[in-house]
Amino acid sequence: MLALPGSLYLRQGDEIALSDSDKPTAPLELADMVAEHTQVQSSQFGSPTATVRHAAHVRHEYNLACAPLAFVTGLEWCPPQTLSFLVRGVLVVVNTSDSPVTLPAEAKVLLSSQPLRQEEGRPLVPPATTTWLEATTVA
């Protein structure tokens, strides 16, 4: 959702991956919990907080908030079980399949919701993972 054009809204707790069932009902308890988790996660590479912050940085750098959006089909390396869309210079690939998606070797990954592994020098996008790519490296 952070790649979509328009205003960005996060509910309190989303930035630390806090589920609704884990949220305390008292607002001050929730604020304390978010502050505590944010402090811990800020220095952890790949943590929800670090990922949201990096996504916000890339969103600002590429000016995605006011960019046009286009759905993309026909990429040879992108199976039909994936959702792909282009926002300005960022190609977003959402792997909704049960298998990893192999990206082109020259793909420049800007952000990924899960760690990517490599196979023969090519990044693999695991199932249930969203990856942002610099569009000029994968067209």
What function would you assign to each model-found segment?
Residues 2-11, 16-139:
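Carbohydrate-interacting/catalytic domains
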